[in-house]
């Protein structure tokens, strides 16, 4: 079964902010390569999303939240892609990408998790 992929506005804003950071700290080419790799990883979620680990921060969320770690290069910065799985009899099963976060940031708080969920 193939899952549909949907990104929240917050996830899109996270991608745009990271792209801007890479373009300013390195180059637009580096930013484009990072975004292309990220989008490829997100697209791969359509195949077996439930095979990925539940996020360590899952207890902060109301819905089961999974995490995919993305790193464009072996030594490059890691980004966490937080997502939920949505199923209903009326719609195709959907992976909803909620938030993309640099892995070196401070640990997520319960308040941040609630804000992420409310941005759905």
Language-model features and meaning:
Residues 1-2, 62, 84, 112:
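Small, basic N-terminal interaction modules of short regulatory proteins
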Residues 72-120:
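Enriched for short, Lys/Arg-rich terminal
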Residues 39-51:
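Compact soluble domain cores
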Residues 1-41:
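Arg/Lys-rich, positively charged N-terminal/basic patches that mediate binding to nucleic acids
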Residues 31, 53-57, 109:
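Short, hydrophobic secondary-structure boundary micro-motifs
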């Amino acid at each position: 079964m193939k899952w549909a992929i949907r990104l929240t506005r917050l996830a899109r804003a996270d991608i745009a902010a990271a792209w801007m950071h890479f373009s300013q700290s390195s180059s637009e080419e580096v930013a484009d390569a990072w975004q292309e790799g990220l989008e490829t990883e997100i697209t791969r979620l359509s195949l077996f999303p439930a095979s990925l680990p539940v996020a360590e921060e899952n207890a902060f969320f109301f819905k089961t939240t999974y995490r995919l770690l993305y790193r464009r290069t072996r030594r490059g910065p890691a980004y966490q892609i937080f997502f939920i799985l949505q199923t209903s009899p009326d719609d195709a099963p959907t992976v909803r990408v909620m938030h993309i976060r640099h892995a070196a940031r401070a640990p997520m708080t319960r308040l941040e998790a609630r804000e992420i969920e409310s941005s759905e």
